[in-house]
Amino acid sequence: MLKTLKDKKLENCSSINNKSKKQQKIIVGLSGGVDSSLSAALLIEDGWKVEGLTLWLMKGEGSCCSEGLVDAAGLCEDLGINHNILDSRVIFEREVVKKTTEGYESGFTPLPCSMCNKNVKFEEMLNFVIKQKEFTYIATGHYARVQKVSCENIKNYENFQFKDFLLLRGADRNKDQSYFLYSLSQEVLSRLILPLGNLKKEETRKEALRLGLRTAKKPESQDLCLVEHYGSMQKFIDNHIEPKEGEIKHINGEILGTHNGIQHFTIGQRKGLGIAWPEPLYVESLDKQKNIVYVANKKDLFKREAIIKEINWVSIEAPLKEIEVEAQIRYRSEPVKGILVPVKNEDNLTKKFKLIFEDNQSSITPGQAAVFYKDEILLGGGLICEFSKI
């Protein structure tokens, strides 16, 4: 075991049963990158019986997935472990490509990574483990942490009814990826090991170099797999959605120009509008029904409330009354204080929540995730479906 990690400890130790690690098999999701590679190597050093699993997601040769498959296979050969490949192209096409396309067509700005984590990656890994029966746990290279609930880690949160396992931010806030994991189930968390949860990115590189991993110097991917495959999100959109001309209107009602499809715009966008105005204008909202792009001054982008749907309560039971949270409405944004209020439908059931911010927020974007935290604990998250006009 690496001395540098002895003090930090591998994550999820509290959820591991007393059975010797050498008797337990773990499947590690391998993308071909340095993070997942190091996760596998660290688990091997820690005494686990490790096998790799790579999901084949994208159709076509020369894609990011085919390169990742080659790198992952080579890594497994270097480490002396089995490499499993799972053909997930059909489910990825249905759950990510199709739903991303539908989102853009509806005037939303989808979050493909969350779709993939929710309906493809972790579900496929979990199903693989359950089907194979020989594996006990799954692991990935995400910068986040999982802890089993104890009196110690929830003693300051009396207002919440916690589930058995907590999802927490990664120790490196600059690399924390918990935002993308808000859709995970307790079943997944109960089996999930995150070896990098307590590490900083620079430590990851150093350890990968020290261990001589072939991926140690591999550049970090900054793009979605859809972007890497198609070249840009614009090319993905052009490949899947037909252009449809519509109007660009100022929120005061004045027609300023035309566009070739609302799928090309997102809330807060300034560049590429192709209109003239005395001062900078930004996309304020998108009207799918009328095919109109509304623009406004920057001050008009600030809103106080948003409606959140399809909420997954990761670490707590669904609250029955309003709660105070720290909400993160995009991956790189800082969490902001707000109140979540249950919204009941005509059947008196709570299907949505209203998120009321302490301070007005700019460019609240339907289709993106709103993720709720209490300090380091990720409580839950859902999709922004609308925002207030105030």
Swiss-Prot record:
Record site: Interaction with tRNA: 142, 368
A GO-annotated cellular component: cytoplasm
Domain of life of the native organism: Bacteria
InterPro entries (alphabetical): MnmA-like, MnmA-like_C, MnmA-like_central, MnmA-like_central_sf, Rossmann-like_a/b/a_fold
Known function: Catalyzes the 2-thiolation of uridine at the wobble position (U34) of tRNA, leading to the formation of s(2)U34.
The keyword Cell division is annotated on this UniProt entry: no
Molecular function GO terms recorded: ATP binding; tRNA binding; tRNA-uridine 2-sulfurtransferase activity
Species lineage: Bacteria, Bacillati, Cyanobacteriota, Cyanophyceae, Synechococcales
Family (UniProt): Belongs to the MnmA/TRMU family.
CDD domains: MnmA_TRMU-like
Coiled-coil annotated spans: none
Compartment annotation: Cytoplasm
EC number: 2.8.1.13
Biological process, per Gene Ontology: tRNA wobble position uridine thiolation
Family matches, as Gene3D superfamilies: Adenine nucleotide alpha hydrolases-like domains, HUPs, Translation factors
Record region (Interaction with tRNA): 175-177, 330-331
Predominant localisation class: cytoplasm
Top-level EC class: transferase
Residue pairs linked by disulfide bridges in the UniProt entry: 116-225
Protein name: tRNA-specific 2-thiouridylase MnmA
Positions of the catalytic residues: 116 (nucleophile), 225 (cysteine persulfide intermediate)
Reaction it catalyzes: S-sulfanyl-L-cysteinyl-[protein] + uridine(34) in tRNA + AH2 + ATP = 2-thiouridine(34) in tRNA + L-cysteinyl-[protein] + A + AMP + diphosphate + H(+)
Pfam families in UniProt: tRNA_Me_trans (PF03054), tRNA_Me_trans_C (PF20258), tRNA_Me_trans_M (PF20259)
Record SUPFAM superfamilies: Adenine nucleotide alpha hydrolases-like
NCBIfam families with a match to the protein in the record: PRK00143.1 (NF001138), trmU (TIGR00420)
Keywords (A to Z) from UniProt: ATP-binding, Cytoplasm, Disulfide bond, Nucleotide-binding, RNA-binding, Transferase, tRNA processing, tRNA-binding
Keyword ATP-binding (UniProt): yes
